């Protein structure tokens, strides 16, 4: 497929690359599956949501007169002409549910909040972020939306009705007057646009640029109106489904419309996300350790200037292929207590970098050290002067590790003891014994591996894949121990000379302990940038 695309004359155009990136992200994020899940959620929660809306409007006597008007506006803007029959059923259900007890009303509020939480989770998955705020904070935020939203909407309709009733605005001059029907449609469309923009800007836990949210909101609002118009025409001319479903014909049409709507809404989330990523430069993806140090260097520089660092600034130091991992990197820096979040949602330095070495920082991460091929790419695309010092030390560390590990595997296995077959009775081997056996195995591995990553709840070690879009989950069982942990475990079993292991480990520690993180970043101004002529890897 890629070979065919390269033959297209517009293959290198920016707009085509953006579309490829957008469609690829939508497929990779299982957009259609998320839309199907949200369709099912909407089907179960649409009556409770509308009931809550009507209950809040009924609680204010001044807004009682605009209940029916608001319901009609919602149905006409969100449903095509063929779905208005379903809207009558939904409205009847909501009217009957308005006479609930306090417990029933509370259950409706809980259902509404759970629906909004499900939508928020889908948006956050597209933005590659986790739920950072506590449950109480989210509940308070959504409770505010649920209660104030209908009140603001009802007040707007009251003001609109009052303006239309003014006598001087209804007078005709030379046969011309104000076409209120046209302006009502314009205002309704403007409210739809504002709703989509607010959705894309407010719901994700990431700080979405307002410009990108506005572009996505306008596109989705216009496409939504076109889709609603087209869907209504198709369904009105395609009547054979009524012969199949009979009285239930409105239900599959309604489900299909909700499914298409959620696909479009999630596509808008992808547009805002892709616009944010596409604004960065497309560079070769660096080793995660180098990306983390680059982010930490930015926070350190801003801290020295008495400033904090925003999420947008942290994302700006990453390349296009590195950006999908930015939130994971951010969590690593926070878990290592190197940075902390301010009340405004920005980040400042938390720990004195003179008191932490590169080796100590590396031991908290689930990544192996960079290898020569990755360092060659860094030297060719060096953007920060402190990399010159870092690359030299990594090259020396890899050279020494290669010397210590240059031993045939057959020679290692020659020291292994013959295995004895152990028969275990499944009737005697209980679940408690299995748990104890797993605990013993995990504690043995943790002693020779990275204790900070295993015991503090950090992510398991994973092999670095520069082309991977998202890092493996923290629950992944395919963890790989760092080379020194493997050798240490082998030395404990007697398969490798323990003196060789100690020598290798101590040498690596000394190489990285010589440089504190503050001393490393201080080379930004003094150390020269490595060029192709003085590359130590050549």
From Swiss-Prot:
Biased composition, class Basic and acidic residues, residue ranges: 503-514
Region (Disordered): 427-538
Keyword terms of this UniProt record: Cell inner membrane, Cell membrane, Membrane, Transmembrane, Transmembrane helix
Position of the signal peptide: none
TM stretches of this protein: 43-63, 100-120, 143-163, 183-203, 215-235, 247-267
InterPro entries documented for this protein: UPF0761_bac, Virul_fac_BrkB
Ranges annotated as biased composition (Low complexity): 482-493
A Pfam family: Virul_fac_BrkB
Family listed: Belongs to the UPF0761 family.
Name the record gives this protein: UPF0761 membrane protein PsycPRwf_0630
Organism encoding this protein: Psychrobacter sp. (strain PRwf-1)
Classification lineage: Bacteria, Pseudomonadati, Pseudomonadota, Gammaproteobacteria, Moraxellales
